[in-house]
């Protein structure tokens, strides 16, 4: 049987968690018990509905597909903790997975009475009409004086207590079986045929064709063109198979693609309803799953990489290129991490290529201003580079005296802009800037990273030089294909062709340390097997923690506040796992208080590429009063703070010509978003203003002023430093935007060889880090486009040093 155990508290140390963990081990041969934590469950707030959030949907799916639920509750003020009450509220507000589900209550407490009063209240709560759980009567397991009940291994010490728990659990297994028989749905019958339905995915509509026979779901076809490649692929493959195999709608959503997963399930439900059956009956059916016996799987390799995003896959590819073995462990079902969510352009100074493009109005003035900057404002370690850069700029300006000239760039400009872009002061007055040797390594090797990617099959669009929001300068190399998936598709194919092993749904729990050297990892796979990977070196590439709001709030020293309900552009996998692993072996942290918001995110989803996302030279940002409020060419944190100061919600205004410069969209997607009311379109600015509830006169004046600034090449209001197109050709568009968490600059402290350093500044032998899990490069603010340069550069560096220092010496 399969049960879920809910830890009824979010306390870091909990005897109720210890009790469930003991039950998980003790009853492993009888049943599978999956433990669910309340740590990231938001407090219940009816006015801020989070029913569709990943964490709530995950709880709902796990409960609905289990044979029973075990709740371990402590006692707080004679009742249940607020965290437990909140999850039950969420699970009875708009969804009801506990309805009719078998529930066993256990509890541990310091008191001699155990959690008796809390259990009584919990029974009353679970019996409420909106919850309607089937709670096992009697057989209350009350563990009193819990602080002395467990031994050092977390096992119950008193045999009589274990015996009583055995009897309670045996009764619960019988009880769950009886409840399941009572809940068993009657046989279904459908009107046979193929039903065309439309569900809602993450990015828009999902047209589906569902074929039903008289009593079975026979086939599910989905038009996947609206969804982002690399993110929802696993959902499209796995969800239909599981629905058909189990003839049930009670299937688990795919981590990282939960919205799309539920969209597919809802689409089939609509077809079932059209065929004359009740889809709720199919939701009560549970897929038959055999409980795997506890097992240990051991693997030996040269280098193990934690995380299958861009940095991790790059590291694995470089290890394989060197003729060695690599194993990549990824906690989510799909590879790609945040890289598949990236816009695509990666920064690398390539003057020979860039000089074929004309300079934009304002770019030469930006260079002139930088050249005239007082050297005393530059950190000492950067001054020699700054002097050389001034010479380069002065020579360029002398040679390009005409109005436009060609686009200038150099490795030194990239380096100094990365340094200045990351120079920030936190709320405590603490100044931070990028570590010189790391920034130098990044900017010196970024172009080599582009060339290396080309060598393994990534194709770049050399007809345009692009600039992501907040990049400051046009040096973006954009791949052909869809978003960052172009990188991941190529990297995955290369790793697999070279004999690399990729294990998905295998989160790493701890690092293996032997004689002071990190020599592997311990993980758990989807079959609940313990996976031990022995390796000569470990590379952490598991990303940052922008999807972990509590962790952001814990470390934050930059933003005046980070709201509990803040959206994120990130994969839900970005919860700081690698940082936890690193600190478990003594790693130092750097810059943890600085996180980056993406100012131009979808207000509802945090999605980056909805609406019209265009180059910043074409950004026209207006607040809810129809007025510009910021230099749209500024850094991400400048844009974010300005947005927050103006009520957070704002609009990107575009015309038909600017629309043509939008990234990663199609006319069909644009039309669909207009129809859905997430993008606004009108033939006049007056009509557009009325659609979005702002003063038409204010918006019309704002656009007229902006167009004059474009003609003049100068912005006297906000000093925008680069312009391209005017807003002049109908139809006109308004894309609603709002800041969302995007990147965490802080992380494990590394040196320029990607070694992880301990709190004494010494190398942790055998441990390397690359990508967002590492700190020190971007300091207080990351330039747009630099993260991709970072992951591909330091992924290669980490692999090269891991092989040279730990693999080659062993095999030589």
Swiss-Prot record:
InterPro entries for this protein: FAD-dep_OxRdtase_2_FAD-bd (IPR003953), FAD-oxidoreductase_2 (IPR050315), FAD/NAD-bd_sf (IPR036188), Flavocytochrome_c (IPR010960), Flavoprotein-like_sf (IPR029039), FMN-bd (IPR007329), FMN_Rdtase-like_dom (IPR005025), Succ_DH/fumarate_Rdtase_cat_sf (IPR027477)
Catalysis: reaction(s): dihydrourocanate + A = urocanate + AH2
Binding site for FAD: 311, 330, 338-339, 343-344, 577, 743, 772, 788
Cofactor dependence: FAD; FMN
Class of this enzyme: oxidoreductase
Entry EC number(s): 1.3.99.33
FMN phosphoryl serine modifications at: 258
Cofactor note: Binds 1 FAD per subunit. Binds 2 FMN per subunit, one is bound covalently and the other non-covalently.
GO MF: FMN binding; steroid dehydrogenase activity, acting on the CH-CH group of donors
Taxonomic superkingdom: Bacteria
Sequence similarity: Belongs to the FAD-dependent oxidoreductase 2 family. FRD/SDH subfamily.
NCBIfam families, alphabetized: flavo_cyto_c (TIGR01813)
Protein name stated in the entry: Urocanate reductase
The species this protein was found in: Lactiplantibacillus plantarum (strain ATCC BAA-793 / NCIMB 8826 / WCFS1) (Lactobacillus plantarum)
Lineage of producing organism: Bacteria, Bacillati, Bacillota, Bacilli, Lactobacillales
Annotated gene: urdA
